[in-house]
UniProtKB/Swiss-Prot annotation:
It is found in: Nucleus, Nucleolus. This is Proapoptotic nucleolar protein 1. Residues 169-180 have a biased composition (Pro residues). Residues 185-215 are annotated as: Necessary for nucleolar localization. Signal peptide: none annotated. It comes from Homo sapiens (Human). Apoptosis-inducing protein that modulates the tumor suppressor function of CDKN2A/p14ARF. Enhances the stability of CDKN2A/p14ARF protein by protecting it from degradation. May act as a tumor suppressor. One of its GO terms (biological process) is apoptotic process. Widely expressed. The keyword Chaperone does not apply. GO terms for cellular component: nucleolus. Its main location: nucleus. The keyword Endoplasmic reticulum does not apply.
Amino acid sequence: MGVRLRVWPAAPHSISRCPRPLGAVLSILLAGGSRKGTPTARCLGQRTKEKRVGGRSLRSEAGSGPCPTAGAQPTAPSSAWPPRLRPRTCPQMSGELPRVRPTRVGLSSLGSGPGHPPSGTRMCGERARNRRGRARRLTPEQPRIGASAGPGPPLPPARPRCSGSCHLPRPPQHLSPPQPGRVRMGAAEGSRRADTHHARRRRRARLPAPRSAST
């Protein structure tokens, strides 16, 4: 069974560094190769590595865009393919001109370094400054409600609840001893008390039941 060998012309990227005639290479291949330590084996190993690297470079260029001819350079250095992408960094940190005009607060914070945020803002992860049950500190522009309000009328003292079934409020009792000139007024007040609705109901309950006309 014969073995057919096909030889392609050497490409410019696959030219080995150690020049060997084509006949010597074919004789080495037909003879079954040589040892790894010989210079011919080294040249063959370098040649296969260069072929692999050249094939990868050609594939990457073919996938990325139009591939110029071997050994040819682009006409202008600025029109290199593919174009270089700039890193996505903050324009303030990289020194480039920002696309959006920053506010005055932002410029002041950039100039002064890590400063405090403006009043009224709450940072992420920050707890509430005022907990429940604690009074907030008043600003000098915020007046106190108690100081601005005028003195109102005095509140009447709370009357104690009477014990028992009486639901009507009792008149205030005089703690001072009774005077002789006010005895008649007290009797008049007693007669008025007896004429209340509650007293009338009590009287009706005490009276005997009316007899029926049939008896």
